[in-house]
C-alpha cells in the first residue's frame, strides 16, 4: 500500500533532505489559520489549515533564517510533479516570496525556478540541492550576497520572535529588504511598493520593517506618513508598542516639533501641510531639513495623488522609501468616469515612482487562507433605478425645492433623472424608505439571535441622503422593538460623515454592543477605521471608483472571533460589486520609467465648480426591489470574484466527486483524519470552502460530512444531534452486545459528536470530558477491545447511520 501525503513527507522526504543538510532548524512549517467552523452558533477554526514547508538558509547561528524555497509532498503513488505546472509553481513561489518550489513523492523530485519559469525533469531525491547550493543560486538571482552590509536587515531577527507574524507578512518584509539590498548593489534609489489587502496587517509589517532596520544599525530617523487621523492614531500606537518613547506624533507645540527627539515620526499630510496639491508645506520645511529621514513609509499611498507626498520624498531623496497600498496592481476599469480616471492616475503615479510591487497579497488569497472573512453578496435592483424618472412623472406629483419646501416649476426640472442622480439632484423619500425596509428586513432575518443588532455600514450618495437613511432605519427599528415588546438600544442608526463630526461616534461603532449599530456615511468610513465586528456593508450609492470600492469592502473583511463574526454580507442595490470583476490595469506615464525617476508633476488646477443647484424632492412613487441573486466571493485565477451560489455549489460538488466518486468512497476517507484533510485541502486549493458553503446554506447545526454528502451525493442531511440519535437507533444491537460500561462510554463519546461534530469525536481530550469520564472513560472502553479500534468503529457507524 502506497504512503499518504503526510506519511510520504515524514517517512521519505524528511529523511532524504535531512541527509542533504536540511536539518530541522532550516525547515519552517507555515500553518495557515484554516477554514472557519461554526459550532453551536459560535465560530472556531478547523484544527489546522494548510501547512506549507519552507526551506531556509542561515548565515550563522545568530541571524534570522531566510526562506528561499517551498517543498510540496505528494502521495507516494503520484508522479513527483503532480499538479505543479508553471502557473501553480509561480503562484506558490510568489505567495511565499521564494525563488524555488520543489515537489516530491519521496523517491523523485522536480523543481520550479521562479526566475526562469522552468520546471526540471524528475530527479532522484538523493540529488536534492544542499543549503550551500541553493544559497549560491539564490544570491545570484537576487543580485547581492548575504554577507553584504546591505543585506544586514534581512538577516536581523524579529525583535519579539517569529510567533506573531504570518507567512505572508514575513514574505512581504523579506521582499522589501531584498529590493533595498539589490538597489544598494546597483546604486539605484531604494524604493519598494507593497500591495496587501485591507485587514492583513500593513501596519504590523511597517513596524517590523523599521524595527529590524533599527536593530541592524541602519535606521537614523524614520517617517511614517498617512492621510487620516484614525490611521495616525493606530500607527502611533503600533509604533510605540515597538519603539516605546522613540516613536512620537508630529505636531507643533509652542513652535517646536513634538517628535523632534524621536527616531520614528508619525504624521499626517495635514500636519506637514501637504494635504493639498497647493498646500503650504511650511511645517515640513521649518522642522525638517533635506535628507533628515533615512527611511520613509507612506501608508495607504493608493489614496494619495503624487502632488501630495512628492515634496516629502524629493526632500529626502536618499531615504529608503516604502509605499503601502491595498489596491490591486492589476486594475483595469472599463468605465472611463472621472473617478476611475483619477484612480488610474494615482495607480500610475505609484507604479511609476516605486516600480511594480515587490510583493502582493490580495483579498482572494487572504480569504482562502482564512485571514479575512468570507463574503456573501445579496444583489438587488430598484425598479426606479432600472428606468429613470421623467419630467412628466415628477410634475404630476407636486415637486418641491428640497431646501425650502417651495414648489418648483417644470423649467427647474430635468427631462429625465437617471439612477446616478437619485438622492443627489432628485430626492425620492419613497425610494429611501423602500430600500431601508428591504435592508432592515434582510438583516433581521439573517440572524435570528442578533436580529437587527448587527454592526452595519451603509454607503450613501450625499450627506443629506445619509441623514434620511439613518432616520428611516431608526423608525424601522423603533417599530420592530415595539412589535416585539423589547427595549430599544439607542442610538441605533447614526450618521457618520465629515460634516457631522462622525469620528466622535467611531468608538461606539467599534466597541459598543448596546448602541450604534447602523452607520450611514458617504465616504468617511471608506478607510482608516478598524471595526472588526461589522457584519454588513450596504451600497445605497452608485460607485465608479474601483479604489474606493475596495476600501469600502475592506470595512467588512476583518474577522472578529470574539463575536463569532467569520463572514460578512454585502447588500448591493446599485451594482457596486461589479467592480470586483474589474482588472483596472493602468500604465505608468511614458516619461522616465522603471520606478527610478520622479513622479509626474501636478496637472493644471481646475476652476472651482459653480454652486450646486438645490435638489428637487418628490413623493408618491411606488418602489419595489427585484432580487438579482446571491453570490459568494471566491478566488478565481488568483482574483476575488463574485460567483453565483448555484455555480459555486456545482463547482464544489464536481471537485469533491472528482476526489471521491461515490458516497462510500467519501465516507471511507472521511473517517480517516489524514485522508479527510486531503479531501478538504483539494477542495480549498480549487477555490472553494466547505465551511463557507455551510454558512451560506445556514446549516450550522450540521457536520461538514452531511453538508458535503448532501451536495455531492444527494444524502439526506442530518443535524449533528439527529445523526447521534440515528447512531443509537440503527446500531442498538451492536451497542447492546458490548459490556455495559463500554456501551455507556461509547454513548457518551457519541454525544460529543452532537456538540462538536467530526472533530468532537477526534478531540484528543475526549477522555477528560466530564460525560465520558463519568461513563468510565478509556478504562471502561478496554473491556470492548483496543480503545483505538473501538473508537474507529464508532466513527464508521456514526457516519453510516
Model feature map: region roles:
Residues 1-221, 230-246, 260-264, 270, ...:
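ATP-dependent helicase/translocase motor core
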Residues 77, 99, 270-271, 295, ...:
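Conserved RecA-like P-loop NTPase helicase motor core
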Residues 158-162, 175, 412-424, 434, ...:
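Long, largely alpha-helical accessory region at the distal end of helicase-like NTP-driven motors
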Residues 197-198, 300-303, 315-334, 370:
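Conserved helicase ATPase motor motifs in RecA-like P-loop NTPase domains
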Residues 229-253, 472-481:
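Conserved helix-turn-beta segment of the N-terminal RecA-like "Helicase ATP-binding" lobe
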Residues 263, 415-521:
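Conserved C-terminal RecA-like helicase domain
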Residues 284-323:
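SF2 helicase catalytic motif II
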Residues 336-453:
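Interdomain helical connector at the RecA1-RecA2 junction of SF1/SF2 helicase-like NTPases
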Amino acid at each position: 500500500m502506497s504512503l499518504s501525503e503526510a506519511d510520504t513527507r515524514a517517512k521519505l522526504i524528511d529523511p532524504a533532505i535531512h541527509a542533504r543538510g536540511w536539518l530541522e532548524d532550516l525547515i519552517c512549517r507555515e500553518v495557515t489559520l484554516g477554514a472557519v467552523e461554526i459550532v453551536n452558533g459560535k465560530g472556531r477554526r478547523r484544527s489546522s489549515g494548510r501547512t506549507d514547508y519552507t526551506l531556509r538558509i542561515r548565515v550563522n547561528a545568530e541571524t534570522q533564517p531566510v526562506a528561499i524555497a517551498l517543498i510540496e509532498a505528494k502521495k507516494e503513488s503520484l508522479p513527483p510533479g503532480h499538479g505543479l505546472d508553471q502557473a501553480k509553481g509561480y503562484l506558490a513561489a510568489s505567495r511565499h516570496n521564494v525563488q524555488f518550489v520543489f515537489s516530491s513523492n519521496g523517491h523523485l523530485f522536480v523543481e520550479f525556478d521562479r526566475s526562469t519559469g522552468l520546471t526540471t525533469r524528475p530527479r532522484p531525491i538523493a540529488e536534492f540541492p544542499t543549503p550551500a547550493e541553493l544559497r549560491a543560486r539564490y544570491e545570484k538571482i537576487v543580485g547581492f550576497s548575504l554577507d553584504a552590509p546591505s543585506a544586514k536587515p534581512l538577516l536581523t531577527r524579529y525583535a519579539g520572535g517569529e510567533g506573531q507574524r504570518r507567512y505572508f507578512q514575513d514574505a512581504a518584509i523579506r521582499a522589501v529588504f531584498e529590493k533595498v539590498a539589490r538597489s544598494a548593489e546597483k546604486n539605484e534609489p531604494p524604493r519598494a511598493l507593497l500591495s496587501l489587502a485591507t485587514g492583513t496587517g500593513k501596519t504590523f509589517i511597517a513596524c517590523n520593517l523599521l524595527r529590524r532596520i533599527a536593530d541592524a544599525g541602519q535606521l537614523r530617523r524614520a517617517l511614517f506618513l498617512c492621510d487620516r487621523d484614525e490611521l495616525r492614531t493606530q500607527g502611533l500606537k503600533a509604533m510605540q508598542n515597538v519603539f516605546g518613547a522613540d516613536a512620537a506624533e508630529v505636531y507643533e507645540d509652542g513652535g517646536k516639533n513634538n517628535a523632534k527627539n524621536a527616531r520614528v515620526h508619525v504624521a499626517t499630510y495635514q500636519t506637514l501641510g501637504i494635504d493639498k496639491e497647493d498646500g503650504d508645506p511650511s511645517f515640513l520645511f521649518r522642522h525638517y531639513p533635506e535628507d533628515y529621514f533615512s527611511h520613509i513609509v507612506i501608508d495607504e499611498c493608493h489614496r494619495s495623488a503624487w502632488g501630495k507626498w512628492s515634496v516629502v520624498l524629493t526632500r529626502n531623496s536618499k531615504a529608503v522609501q516604502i509605499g503601502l497600498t491595498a489596491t490591486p496592481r492589476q486594475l483595469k476599469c472599463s468605465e472611463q468616469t472621472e473617478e476611475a480616471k483619477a484612480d488610474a492616475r494615482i495607480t500610475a503615479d505609484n507604479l511609476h515612482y516605486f516600480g511594480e510591487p515587490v510583493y502582493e497579497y490580495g483579498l482572494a488569497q487572504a480569504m482562502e487562507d482564512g485571514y479575512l472573512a468570507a463574503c456573501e453578496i445579496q444583489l438587488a435592483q430598484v425598479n426606479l433605478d432600472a428606468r429613470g424618472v421623467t419630467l412628466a412623472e415628477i410634475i404630476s406629483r407636486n415637486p418641491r425645492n428640497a431646501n425650502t419646501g417651495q414648489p418648483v416649476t417644470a423649467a427647474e426640472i430635468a427631462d429625465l433623472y437617471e439612477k446616478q442622480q437619485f438622492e443627489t439632484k432628485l430626492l425620492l423619500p419613497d425610494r429611501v424608505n423602500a430600500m431601508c425596509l428591504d435592508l432592515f428586513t434582510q438583516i433581521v432575518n439573517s440572524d435570528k439571535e442578533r436580529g437587527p443588532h448587527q454592526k452595519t455600514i451603509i454607503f450613501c450618495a450625499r450627506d443629506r441622503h445619509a441623514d434620511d437613511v439613518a432616520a428611516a432605519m431608526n423608525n424601522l427599528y423603533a417599530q420592530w422593538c415595539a412589535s416585539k415588546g423589547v427595549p430599544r438600544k439607542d442610538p441605533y442608526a447614526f450618521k457618520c460623515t465629515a460634516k457631522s463630526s462622525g469620528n466622535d461616534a467611531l468608538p461606539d461603532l467599534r466597541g459598543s454592543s448596546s448602541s450604534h449599530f447602523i452607520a450611514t456615511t458617504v465616504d468617511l468610513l471608506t478607510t482608516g477605521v478598524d471595526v472588526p465586528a461589522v457584519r454588513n456593508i450596504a451600497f445605497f450609492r452608485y460607485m465608479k471608483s474601483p479604489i474606493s470600492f475596495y476600501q469600502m469592502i475592506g470595512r467588512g473583511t476583518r474577522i472578529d472571533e470574539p463575536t463569532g463574526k467569520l463572514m460578512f454580507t454585502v447588500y448591493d442595490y446599485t451594482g457596486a460589486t461589479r467592480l470586483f470583476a474589474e482588472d483596472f490595469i493602468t500604465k505608468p506615464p511614458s516619461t522616465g520609467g522603471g520606478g527610478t525617476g520622479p513622479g509626474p508633476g501636478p496637472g493644471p488646477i481646475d476652476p472651482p465648480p459653480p454652486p450646486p443647484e438645490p435638489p428637487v424632492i418628490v413623493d408618491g412613487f411606488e418602489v419595489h426591489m427585484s432580487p438579482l441573486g446571491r453570490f459568494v466571493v471566491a478566488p478565481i485565477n488568483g482574483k476575488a470574484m463574485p460567483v453565483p451560489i448555484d455555480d459555486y455549489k456545482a463547482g464544489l460538488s464536481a471537485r469533491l466527486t472528482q476526489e471521491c466518486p461515490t458516497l462510500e468512497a467519501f465516507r471511507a476517507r472521511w473517517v480517516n483524519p489524514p485522508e479527510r484533510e486531503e479531501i478538504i485541502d483539494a477542495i480549498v486549493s480549487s477555490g472553494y470552502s466547505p465551511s463557507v458553503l455551510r454558512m451560506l446554506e445556514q446549516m450550522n447545526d450540521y457536520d461538514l460530512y452531511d453538508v458535503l454528502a448532501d451536495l455531492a451525493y444527494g444524502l439526506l442531511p442530518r443535524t449533528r444531534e439527529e445523526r447521534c440519535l440515528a447512531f443509537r437507533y440503527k446500531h442498538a444491537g451492536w451497542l447492546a452486545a458490548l459490556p455495559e460500561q463500554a456501551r455507556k462510554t461509547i454513548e457518551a463519546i457519541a454525544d460529543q459528536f452532537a456538540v462538536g461534530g467530526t472533530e468532537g469525536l477526534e478531540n484528543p481530550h475526549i477522555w477528560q470530558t466530564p460525560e465520558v469520564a463519568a461513563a468510565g472513560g478509556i478504562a471502561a472502553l478496554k473491556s470492548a477491545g483496543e480503545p483505538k479500534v473501538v473508537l474507529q468503529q464508532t466513527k464508521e457507524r456514526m457516519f453510516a447511520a
